[in-house]
């Protein structure tokens, strides 16, 4: 199976997993320019931006080890663009990561909630990420 097919399989499994946990799936693979969010969900009154990391079982790195600082910054920036695009700043937000290991016939899935914050990409002045 090709890398992109494994990624798509992982994203589909993650969306189904979150749906079965009671979340609403609002967007899949939302894009703005070069920025992308794998899944945008709503968990009761919280907007959840989900990064899905899928790897083959025989890979050298675990999925969670591939989430670099640069990638986190891109995810946070993507979320800011999403909120600006939708013009809806009313809900609290969080960032989740779903790590999936693709084995021959099964997927092993781990869900990590609230793994990083908007302020991680801010400078030391802690300027608000909201537009006002």
From Swiss-Prot:
Domain of life of the organism encoding this protein: Bacteria
Signal peptide: none
One Gene Ontology MF term: nucleic acid binding
Source organism per UniProt: Lawsonia intracellularis (strain PHE/MN1-00)
NCBIfam families, per database record: PRK12497.1-3 (NF009150), PRK14680.1 (NF011273), YraN family protein (TIGR00252)
HAMAP family reported for this sequence: UPF0102
Family matches, as SUPFAM superfamilies: Restriction endonuclease-like
Gene3D superfamilies named in the record: 3.40.1350.10
Family classification: Belongs to the UPF0102 family.
Entry protein name: UPF0102 protein LI0223
